[in-house]
């Protein structure tokens, strides 16, 4: 990911929930809710 605010191309498995997330500078997906997203699964818990 080149843009820290860019949305990930795939969903991440965060805390047992599949949820959209934002990309960080690494290639790995970190759990953080995107600013604008349509959830197809329950939101992740705030704390893991």
Swiss-Prot record:
Gene Ontology molecular functions: sodium channel regulator activity; toxin activity
Further remark: Negative results: has no effect when intracerebroventricularly injected into mice.
GO cellular component term, pick one: host cell postsynaptic membrane
Tissue specificity of this protein: Expressed by the venom gland.
Protein's job: Insecticidal neurotoxin that reversibly inhibits the N-methyl-D-aspartate (NMDA)-subtype of ionotropic glutamate receptor (GRIN) and inhibits inactivation of insect sodium channels (Nav). Inhibits glutamate uptake in rat brain synaptosomes. In vivo, induces immediate excitatory effects when injected intrathoracically in houseflies and cockroaches.
Location (main, coarse): secreted
Family: Belongs to the neurotoxin 03 (Tx2) family. 05 subfamily.
Localization, UniProt: Secreted
Source species taxonomy: Eukaryota, Metazoa, Ecdysozoa, Arthropoda, Chelicerata
Domain notes per entry: The presence of a 'disulfide through disulfide knot' structurally defines this protein as a knottin.
Sorted UniProt keywords: Disulfide bond, Ion channel impairing toxin, Ionotropic glutamate receptor inhibitor, Knottin, Neurotoxin, Postsynaptic neurotoxin, Secreted, Toxin, Voltage-gated sodium channel impairing toxin
Entry protein name: Delta-ctenitoxin-Pn1b
Disulfide-linked positions: 1-15, 8-21, 12-48, 14-31, 23-29
